[in-house]
Amino acid sequence: MSVRLTVIGCSPAWPNPGSAQSGYLLESDSRALLLDCGPGVLGRLPGRGAHVDAIAITHFHLDHCGDLIPWAWFTAYAPPNREKLPELWLPPGGVEELAVFARFWGVPWMWERTFTLHEYEPEKRFKAAGFEIEAIKVPHYGIQAFGFRVRLNGKTFAYSGDSAPAEELVELARGADFFLVEATLASGDKDGALRGHLSADEALAAADGPVLLTHRPAELRAPQGIPVAHDGMVVEI
């Protein structure tokens, strides 16, 4: 049985015109896993996420997790018709990081009423929505950030999250049936001394099979012959 990838949003840290930020939906056999949940994603999900079984967050930059906040308000004021809360898988220490925000806003209950909270461990596999996931640490401006290898039905899907060029990224993509990889930069020298993103050439150099570039600014041309993600795009893996 195939796995379907739907690009809900794919903008970089500044939104492309009319586009949501990072959110990628994997579905198979009535199971649904959302990778990242940036601004604009919730409103573009079918049923505003009512069928999403689990969410996994690569890192805590706003363009990858910002719509967790409206998801909480939606659940509080217009709760979807569902039997149980979706699982939310966070990087190590993530539960407390969210709790700090909730206390600051004066709503310490917001996350527990919205999600079943979990933290994943680097390099250790965990299961979410029936998918087997391995979180692999990648370099991103010195913060804690991860890419994911996702397995189901004999297929392996790799997602870079946000990453600089690194051997860890190559290992993440090795042997994958499909690699969704960010390509934010026009060239590597446009990044800072402490790297955090990839150019298209750097993204392609890490690939080991079929690839889809994402997190790509609208201002940059797509490399000739290389597919680039757009909102609403559907890929069968």
Annotated model-derived regions:
Residues 31, 82-86, 207-211:
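A short helix->loop->beta-strand "cap" motif at the edges of active sites that frequently abuts
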Residues 1-48, 145-161, 178:
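Conserved beta-strand hairpin/beta-sheet module of binuclear metal-dependent hydrolase folds
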Residues 14-19, 112, 119-188:
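Active-site-proximal loop/helix segment associated with metal-binding centers of metalloenzymes
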Residues 40-87, 175-177:
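Active-site metal-binding motif and surrounding structural segment of the metallo-beta-lactamase
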Residues 164-237:
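Cap/insert and terminal regions of metallo-dependent hydrolase folds
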Residues 81-86, 94-117:
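Active-site neighborhood of divalent metal-dependent phosphoester bond hydrolases
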Residues 34-38, 53-63, 91, 157-161, ...:
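Active-site neighborhood of phospho(di)ester-bond hydrolases with catalytic His/Asp-centered motifs
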Residues 6, 89, 116-121, 134-136, ...:
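General small-molecule cofactor/ligand-binding pocket signal
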